[in-house]
Amino acid sequence: MQEPPVYPPPYKPPEMKVFYFLAFVFGLVIVISLSIYYYTEMLWFESVGYENVFLTYLKHSLGFFFLEFIIFFVPLFLTNVAVRKVTLEFHGEPLKIPHLADFGIAFFAALTVKNYWSSMLFYFNSSNFGVSDPIFGIDAAFYTFQLPFLKIVIGSLLAALLISLAIAAFAYMYAFRWVKSLEEFKEIFPGSGFMHFSALLFASFLLSAALIYLSRFEIVHSEHGLISGASYVDVNILSPSLMFLSAIVLLSGIFAAYIVARRRVERVFQIVGVLFVIAILLTFVAPFFVQKFVVEPSELSYEGRYIAYSINYTLFAYNLHDVKLQKFDYWDVVNYNDILEAKDTIDNIRIWDHRPIRDVFRQLQQIRTYYVIQDVDVDRYRINDSYVQLLLAARELSTENLPSRAQTWLNKHLIYTHGYGIVASPVNKVSKEGLPEFYIYDIPPEGLIKIERPEIYYGELTDDYVVVNTLQEEFDYPKGDVNFFTKYAGDGGIKLDYFRKVLFSFRFGDINLILSNYITDESRLMMHRDIVERVSTIMPFFVYDDDPYVAVIDGEIWWIIDAYSVLQNFPYSAEVRGFNYMQNPVKVFVNAYNGSVRFYVVQEDAYVRALEKALPGVFLKDMPEEFRKHIRYPRDYFEVQAHIYSTYHMKDVTAFYNREDVWAVAKEKYEDDVIEVEPYYVTLAIEDKPEFILMLPMTPVNRDNMIAWMAARCDEKYGELIIYEFPKGELIYGPMQIEARIDQDSELSKLFTLWNQAGSRVIRGNLLVVPINHSVLYVEPVYLRGESAKIPELRLVIVVQDEELATGTNLYEALENLFKGEKPAEKPATPEKPSETVEEKLEILREYYSKLVDAAKNGDWETFGEMLKKIGEVLGYEGE
């Protein structure tokens, strides 16, 4: 009688006590670290008045993490239990996979998707757009707020099941490693094990079918060469194919579960192979052939309705559906009276570009090496009853610029805590030396705008924590050889006690917070001082403009940041920079002294309404008038809109298909490069009243003549977009054509050459297109920078109107030269006129240059030096 075979027992894991202890210690360290981080973060949220926001985030982030943890842990745990049961049934003792492994895999799997917690917040607080997609008739909120969360949850479940399936397969392979063939395995493997595999397979097929079914909704925001959104093939071939494929996968799951339960495991691989082939045929081959042989020969007739969908939904997604179209009745000639009538416009034409004036500000107004002027911004103010555009820059403090020996912990965190004041100049004023006039200047700040709180504790360069209200006074500002000190008098920051000092020492890895004798219970710790990081910590759901600008409001310095609603899956909308929906619903104000943050809604959309549901009381509707005076239409957003509108202004399907009237942003020459014109702010009388607008000239694609200009209003009718179209049959010069005319002007060419030969570098600034009455004025500033000097000087302003070109040392002189011979009834107030015209200076320079060359040839170096000095005097340089 043959004895039954003796099978080896399953693997017994070694004692895990040491491992468990180390895992416990590791877990404890993580828990303590996270607890310290979240508690100190809660203290910060409490200090800025957003404690409820933090608690909402904590609830949703932890809720989402635990949801994902459960999604992964339950299948893994049940699989582990099943493996133990099956191996116990066969061997008499179980194969024990530690449950800590289930916990660890689930924990780290949940960590990988934890940053998607906002999808749950939007899912449960979804708000309708009021716009339904034309294919399925579902509100756009389903695609933007609900579908992403459903896909994450179902995808996580499927991933958990596939991991469980793989673990079960490897566990059983190990437990039955002595089996020599599949037939032997099928014969001896317990039926409960096949049922385990059967259940896992069916659940995996079921979830795969669900994901395939949901994927059909994604066709409405797919990208094609022709349009954005579902095309004819997507709607009529791909969508039905995906439904059919989903049903096939579900039926295959039932069949696979049945045959595995009947011990025919090898059939599963055949089923998967057949499904793969069917999927290729349904989702790639069939759509390709229909597109190639049915649609493309008559593409417009098939795709026309879908092109119309793409146009309409794209315009809605970028807030371009209410653009006002106006004809610009172009007249060739502007006379001097037109200039006089447009005095507010002329007085605010920007002849100082932000790059040259930033260099001027840095050289003349940084005052000390540790102060930094990071950027220059444009805003408008009412000064002496005049509407004035100003260029403003904050004077921030960077401890990195302190001498290396002064970069101590005390200096960086307790003494040098804040910047001081701002610098401001009008956009079109220039001194005799070619430098800007200052309306706010020096330390303490002086000028036409009063600043009562010039300290800047929060800004663009404040990227480290500081402690204020300590026993050590803070450096306030220098005055001559004397340094003035101060104590913080605001309510910004987190009040410290000993316990909090310990917590923040752990958080920052800085023991000095505990050891320093200067820090008391009245001290306040300021962190998240970088303004963009600060607002994104409070409200991480927006994309923030990377160019915050500074404003003086009621004597205080405020930062203003534009917040954008950005989505990637809006139906039928064109994609730009990785997204296909962009709005600017919120303006954020940050106080530079106390760090207070306010979120004001200026143009509500569904994205903000969803956040208002989740975070009641955070978004403010009633913006104070003093704040409203300083909001402006953001340039980055305007650039995106212009890019979209350049194509999607063609609402006629045939014209869009043929690309008959595609526009482009006009190009200009800046220094030696050809670049796209950047949107710029001008003061124009849109409705017989001067107002602050953002504008951009447009040209036909691959051509240089102007076809239209786009304007965004910033004052009373904030956010209104207007397109002014020029007459189709007339040639209106674009910026590059004006640049070419300037290049071809022989007198200017000689002057530029002479300046370059005299040791200076000519910098041609931005060419501005300024609509005046029914014509266009072109203005380009020209700067000089000496080889050794870092300060650019404005030396020339070029103005062009129709066929006329004129220059002057300032805008008013250039305009007088442009309209010389005309006798206006009155004359705009102008700066003191230089004694010599440009033409006279050119003649003098030619004479001096000729004598300089002759002296060099004859070796008369005394005369050479004298002539070189005189050339420098004519150009505005004095001294040797």
Curated annotation (Swiss-Prot):
Record's keyword annotation contains Membrane: yes
Annotated TM spans: 19-41, 61-83, 103-125, 152-174, 195-217, 237-259, 268-290
Pfam annotation, one family: UPF0182
Record's subcellular location: Cell membrane
Coiled-coil residue windows: none
GO cellular component, one term: plasma membrane
This protein's UniProt keywords: Cell membrane, Membrane, Transmembrane, Transmembrane helix
InterPro entries: UPF0182
Chief location of this protein within or outside the cell: membrane
Membrane topology of the entry: Multi-pass membrane protein
Family membership noted in the UniProt record: Belongs to the UPF0182 family.
Name of the protein in its database record: UPF0182 protein AF_1421
Organism: Archaeoglobus fulgidus (strain ATCC 49558 / DSM 4304 / JCM 9628 / NBRC 100126 / VC-16)
Taxonomic lineage from the root: Archaea, Methanobacteriati, Methanobacteriota, Archaeoglobi, Archaeoglobales
